[in-house]
Every structure is written in structure tokens, then in C-alpha cells.
Amino acid sequence: MKRMAVIFVTLMAASVIVVAQQRGGPPPPPPPLESGASQADVDKALIAAPPNLRNQATVIKWKPADWSYDTLRKGTNTLVCVDNSGLPGQAPFSVECTQRGNLPRMAQNMKIETDPDRAKRQAAVDAMEKDGTRIKPEFGSVWYHLRGQDQATANSHVTIAVPGATMASMGLPESGRGGGVWIMNPGTSTAHLMVPGE
């Protein structure tokens, strides 16, 4: 119940910020690009961002050699977006956004996904869960994904991270069979809320 309250308060706070931004004057201009950054790269990464957060989001670009990143544009809100298209383990078109605090988790995910063997990837995740080295996402953070063969046919997918959550801790089902919001991967650092239609 406590975690549900945290999610509720987070969503309400975000709603208040959005409403407040809509009431004022025009939104501030987007932040400038970092030296050497391409506007096309920034624009592509931002496709996954909600319209109300897109203008001030940070945009990064992965460096696959070590999964560190370069900042293409430093935003003023907490959202960070990246174009993963064609990188190891990713769809030909793949963009995602989440909260800045999830960057260590994103980098760890990218490292894991470089292994083409699905069973080995899952074994690596299971081992990290067991030994405590799996980096947790921020509780209540939203992940926005858009993936597919190309932008025109890409599917949108939105999840809310609730690491460690179970039916006992949140009061939500651990299966989507009944319809409505449910917890996928309960009890793990990967636990997240699935929202039908998102």
C-alpha cells in the first residue's frame, strides 16, 4: 500500500507540473545541442518522449565500446532519451526515454543485450538478481519505448518500474489474464507495471 501511495503521489505531482506548464506562457525553447551533436540524432531519440516533456529532455548517445555515453543535449527536466536503433540486441528502430536516475540500469541492460544468445542473457540477469549486482531502476519511474522495423511500424510500450513489487506488497495481480494493470516479473528488480493498451 505504501508503494501504491508513492506511485500515486508521483503521478499526481507530474500531472500538477504538466497542468501548471500548460497555463503559463509559451514553453521555454529547447536547450542547445552539445558541440558536435546532430539535430537529427536528437530529434530521433525524442520520438519516444511524451509531448509535454520532449522539449526539455536530455538526449544521450551510447558508446558501445564500454556503454558509457555522450550527452547530445542537456535538458532541464528529469527525462533522458536515447536512440538504440540497430545496436546489439535492439530492433532496427528503437528509441526509449526514462528518468535520468535510470541511466546506470540502462547501461547495464545494453551490456547484457550484446550477447546474441537469449538463454545466456537470461542466465546473466538471473545471476545478477541472485548476487545483488542487478542495478535497480527508480521506483515509480516511467519507461517509454518505441520499437519496430522502422518508425512507421514501430510499437509504443510504456511501463512503470516497481522493483521488488509483488501482489502482496502492491495489491495488484501478477498476471494480465484478468485485464487491467498488473505486475510483470514480480519480486525482482525488473518488476514493472503493465498497463493494457500502452
Descriptions of predicted regions:
Residues 1-4:
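Positively charged n-region of N-terminal signal peptides that target proteins for export
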Residues 7-16:
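Bacterial N-terminal signal peptides
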Residues 16-17, 77:
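Generic detector of short, well-ordered, non-transmembrane alpha-helical segments enriched
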Residues 18-22:
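Boundary at the C-terminal end of the N-terminal hydrophobic targeting segment
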Residues 24-198:
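Primary mode marks residue(s) on the alpha4-beta5-alpha5 output face of response regulator receiver
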